[in-house]
Amino acid sequence: NKFHRFDSTLINISGKLLKDGLNLGGKTDDKQIKLSFGLKHSIPSSVRFCTEQAESSEDIALVRAINEAKLEKEDIILFDRGIASANTFKNLTQEEKQFITRINVNRCYELVKTKEVILIPNSDLEIISDEIVNLYARKKKKINNNVRLIKARNKQGDELWFLTNIMHLSSYDIASIYKRRWDIEVFFKFLKQHLQFKHFISYNQNGMQVYIYCLLIAAILFVIFKITNKLSGFKIALLQFTLMLEKAIIKDIVIFSGGNPELVELRL
């Protein structure tokens, strides 16, 4: 319940239809809508409409989304490698915002001290090292901000580097918590595949924002339905919701026609 995930998603729209949007492909007709979301308790907590060309960078867009979001002190912010600025990590630490992310392997840093690694047998990840470091920014400038760098290797042999400012949790806990970031990717998939979050009924910014808010309200109601009925997965929950809605509509038709709605339960 403490995990607050942040990520952005893109929607491609023809530049002939769209006045507002980011040019990410270098062509005037290649415009995209970029939205930065916050997700907590499986429910969208915030959405930010990116309008400036500079916000094509996650170091700007996603950081602004985090800064504008309503965060609790105990929240743990989860985001991917889109945010890579050492200064951003320093600012989050100074603002006492807990975060867990990944960084590119072989990122330049200065070692401050090494933490002891307690191995857990039969784990999906092998922890290679657990270190307190200072990262380097561009032009090899060291940023004086102690962060924790956890190096791990998965079963496929790929090396993963996790970065956090949380010092009291074990390295395995940090890696395990980061997996929960994937929940926002599942949410994006649900929006685009099942709620048709691929098309807009309006192509100006105000109209698109109204549409997005309506869509998110529908998504929140659907998540509440899923949790209330103790259903796992969006696909199964959507099927169950569709069947229940269909039955309710048929009952209304039967009542309107003067029939017995109880017979609907016997036949469906």
Where are these regions (language model features)?
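Single, function-defining residue in the core of a domain
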Residues: N1-K2, F6-L17, K27-L268
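Extracellular beta-strand-rich solenoid/capping regions of secreted or surface-exposed proteins
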Residues: N23-G25
